[in-house]
Amino acid sequence: MNLVQSLSDLGVTNQTINSDQRQRLDTDGFIILPNVLKAKSLDLVRSQLERLYEKEGPGAGIEVHQESGARRLSDLVNKGEVFDQIYTNPRVLACIHHVIGREFKLSSLNARDALPGQGLQGLHADWGKDYDGSFHVCNSIWLLDDFSHDNGCTRLVPGSHKKRLPSKALDDPMKKHPNEEYVIAPAGSVAVFNSHTWHGGTKNTSTNLTRRAIHCYYTARENQQQLNQQEYLRYETFKRLSPAARYILDVDTN
């Protein structure tokens, strides 16, 4: 198994994304894919997340990251078959392949829900070094609620994926950037972005709105994963996965 075979087996072709989408990824560093998760899948994913939040309680998200002011979950690969469709989606994989441009793998599969009155993040990039001519990471935000200015939508700065890190380039990454754009889209959409792009969550200014999302994060295959999938993978998870899905996780033992 290799990446080309894995992507083919998962339904990725040269026509999975179009030239305009590729251009947006190259120029802006992000695109929004509409209607990726249908209503039934949305309901199933939301229900499983809520079960996990209740089950894991204060320990939720501890495998990767916990955040004050947000509900977090980590290691979703092992926490429900309903999540398999997330990291194996052909439209998203085609975008990831276009951005990274070489062999890649899943880095982590996590969830985040910024609570009312919380959620503001400074602009940041997910790769901790300045652009060196290659792209090493690419992320996707799966919207499980409608994203709006009210519930803390994500902000991104188009074209920033080839710039220095925002911590170096900006006086205050917490402030609004004059060029920032917002992920305003209905539930079921997926925002795919080159993770070198400056981005961050905005404040959930509502009193009662959820802002649930799954972060499906990929990295070039030579890099370490945010969560070591080989180390964490449960046997029952491994058994149900296709060889192509195992390859994306980098748990293929062949």
PLM ranges: what are they?
Residues 36, 196-197:
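Short, surface-exposed secondary-structure boundary micro-motifs
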